[in-house]
Swiss-Prot record:
HAMAP family: NaMN_adenylyltr. This is Probable nicotinate-nucleotide adenylyltransferase. The gene is nadD. Keywords: ATP-binding, NAD, Nucleotide-binding, Nucleotidyltransferase, Pyridine nucleotide biosynthesis, Transferase. It comes from the Bacteria. It catalyses: nicotinate beta-D-ribonucleotide + ATP + H(+) = deamido-NAD(+) + diphosphate. The lineage of its organism: Bacteria, Bacillati, Actinomycetota, Actinomycetes, Pseudonocardiales. Pathway: Cofactor biosynthesis; NAD(+) biosynthesis; deamido-NAD(+) from nicotinate D-ribonucleotide: step 1/1. GO terms for molecular function: ATP binding; nicotinate-nucleotide adenylyltransferase activity. It comes from Saccharopolyspora erythraea (strain ATCC 11635 / DSM 40517 / JCM 4748 / NBRC 13426 / NCIMB 8594 / NRRL 2338). It is an enzyme of class 2 (transferase).
Length: 212
């Protein structure tokens, strides 16, 4: 009897997507034998109602650009095309309907898993997918409250990179080369993303630094 398809689901704001996300998805794909990883940019993040978030189309397009070269990566619009706040339960339910024969593996930050009991329709989550928490080396998950066997942890050194840090660097006029894919550096510059209203200095994008 053949094994069911295994599909990874990586949800996130991706504002912007960076190498930490990509390395984490690639590592989990290899370790768990996933056929593909579907990146799902959040539509309206319910946890970030008081934060300024870039338009969904910009975040979607950056994710498409960043993942285009990996044949095992795909990008889904299920969250950004759904009206209202984005909840993981809705994301997984929609993907379950699209891939009824597959086992879903939801990839997220291990720190987020510590708050999972506060998530919308939490009782459904572990029925819809196995959860994989990606974390920095040495991180200890306080997971006594999580169902046994429902969560796996994977250490990813590149998780030290954060979207918040990338936005702060752009706002301060600092480069984000090598923190995000080259195409994302160019997209941010073209769209003028993450620049504060009082940022008169702009960002010195210039050519990509050489390896010499």
């Amino acid at each position: 009897m053949s094994r069911r398809r295994r599909i990874g689901v990586m949800g996130g704001t991706f504002d912007p997507i960076h190498h930490g996300h990509l390395v984490a998805a690639s590592e989990v794909q290899a370790q768990f034998g996933l056929e593909q990883v579907i990146f799902v940019p959040t539509g309206q993040p319910w946890q970030k109602t008081h934060e300024v978030v870039s338009p969904a189309e910009d975040r979607y397009l950056m994710t498409v650009v960043a993942t285009a070269s990996n044949p095992r990566f795909q990008v889904s619009r299920v969250d950004i095309d759904r009206a209202g706040p984005t909840y993981t339960a809705d994301t997984l339910a929609d993907l379950r309907a699209l891939y009824p024969e597959a086992e879903l593996y939801f990839i997220t930050g291990a720190d987020a898993l510590e708050q999972i009991l506060s998530w919308h329709r939490v009782d459904e989550l572990f029925e819809l997918a196995h959860f994989i928490g990606v974390t920095r080396p040495g991180y200890q998950l306080a997971g006594e409250h999580l169902p046994k066997g429902a969560v796996s942890l994977v250490e990813i050194p590149a998780m030290a990179i954060s979207s918040t840090g990338c936005r702060q660097r752009v706002r301060a006029g600092l480069p984000v080369w090598y923190l995000v894919p080259d195409g994302i550096v160019q997209y941010i510059a073209k769209r003028g993303l993450y620049r504060g209203e009082d940022d008169s200095a702009g960002v010195e994008w210039g050519p990509r630094p050489s390896g010499t």
